[in-house]
Every structure is written in C-alpha cells, then in structure tokens.
Amino acid sequence: MKMKAVALFALIACGAAHAASEQVTVHQVTAEGIGKSLGTVKIDETKYGLQFTPDLKGLTPGIHGFHVHAKGSCEPGESEGKVVAAGAAGGHLDPANTGKHLGPYAEGHPGDLPAVYVDDQGNATYPVLAPRLTSLSEIKGKALMVHVGGDNHADHPKPLGGGGARYACGVI
C-alpha cells in the first residue's frame, strides 16, 4: 500500500510539473489568401517565459521579424485602401496600448518576439524565448506572424522594426 501511495504521488507530481504546450500550423499568406503550410511552431510554457520552436521550411534565408498579432485570423484584410496579406490579424499584440515597438525584452508591447533565423536551406528550427509572455492563455486565439524582412525592434528608420510584409501566419 505504501508503494502505491508513493507511485501515485510521483504521478501527480509529474503531471503538475508538466508545462502547457501548443502546436501552431503556419501557412504562407498573400493578399489573395492563405496558402500552403510551411510547417509548425511549438509554443511551450517555461519558467523563463514562452519558448517558440519553429519547424518551418521554404522561407527566404536570413532574419525575419516574428510577432504575436492581436487577432486570430490569417485572412487578408484592408489597410489604407489596400488589401494586405493576413491583414485580418491586426497589429502587434499590445493589450496595454503602449504603442511602443521596443523588442521582446523592453517595456513596449508584448507581441514583439525575438527574430527568427532561417538557414541557407530555407529552414527555421532555432527556438526563441519571449520572457515577457509567461502563459499560453495570454496569446491563445491570436495570430503568430513571420514577416518578410528582419526586425530591429524600433520604429526608425522604418515603422514596426522594418520587417515589412507579412509572409507566414498561424492562429494559436
């Protein structure tokens, strides 16, 4: 009986220690709509913040802006009279309405994630950590976005870090 109690306690402890995780399918997006799947991003709760581990293929090599957007849609949307790829996702997640694009480690909006690195084969597999996001509940139902260009986490010389057009999107 004592062994059963110890085993039961161990199982409960392991279950309690298991952190939440979410797998997001990411698709190429254009002004015409949602395209082919480029892979997935696994999001794990860790004691250091949310960890985003991409398993994406078919991207342009280099650094790409990576953000959580405010709305849970990857459909095209209109902005200033133009149809925008994944425009229905809205802007970067900014629940406190800071209006500041200061990067994943500063006091700007929490939708800023560290940039995603894509190797010369077009694969993104390196995880990034978002220390200001601590729970999947903060981003559930929002859009995860990969931009065409890099991100300097500032509004100069180009707005929103200079990441440019939206290239890939998935709903968390």
Residues of each region from the PLM?
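Gram-negative bacterial Sec-dependent N-terminal signal peptides
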Residues: 1-19
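N-terminal leader/targeting pre-sequences
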Residues: 15-172
